[in-house]
């Protein structure tokens, strides 16, 4: 199903809400200002804390993607995993079954961003 612009309430800042690349173009306070503007317009922004590194120039295979996720998830009670869905990152889809199995084995629960934002999702 398609989503209309009015129903979109969540966003992910390219590079994350604390990225340093934006500072080069908008100055030191740019991300703080962008976060405030998003919130003023009723948007919720979300960051990730686990990165698959699946969109890097090295084009990792499924096994490396899984290792990256396991490394970043270690010690986290709540994991928001950054994955990319592009033609160049076909290995991500191959890694998904093992990622899901890993998180289930570790006792994690799965939920939507809206559930997590409303604190309706149990942590590990």
Residue positions per predicted region:
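Catalytic domains of cell-wall/extracellular-matrix polysaccharide-remodeling enzymes
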Residues: 1-82, 86-109, 115-123
């Amino acid at each position: 199903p398609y989503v209309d612009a009015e129903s979109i309430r969540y966003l992910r800042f390219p590079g994350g809400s604390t990225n340093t690349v934006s500072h080069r173009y908008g100055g030191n306070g740019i991300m703080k200002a962008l976060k405030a503007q998003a919130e003023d317009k009723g948007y919720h922004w979300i960051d990730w804390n686990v990165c698959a590194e699946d969109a890097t120039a090295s084009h990792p295979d499924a096994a490396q993607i899984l290792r990256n996720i396991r490394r970043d998830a270690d010690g986290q009670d709540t994991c928001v995993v950054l994955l990319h869905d592009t033609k160049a990152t076909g290995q991500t889809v191959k890694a998904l079954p093992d990622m899901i199995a890993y998180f289930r084995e570790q006792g994690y629960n799965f939920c939507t961003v809206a559930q997590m934002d409303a604190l309706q999702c149990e942590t590990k």
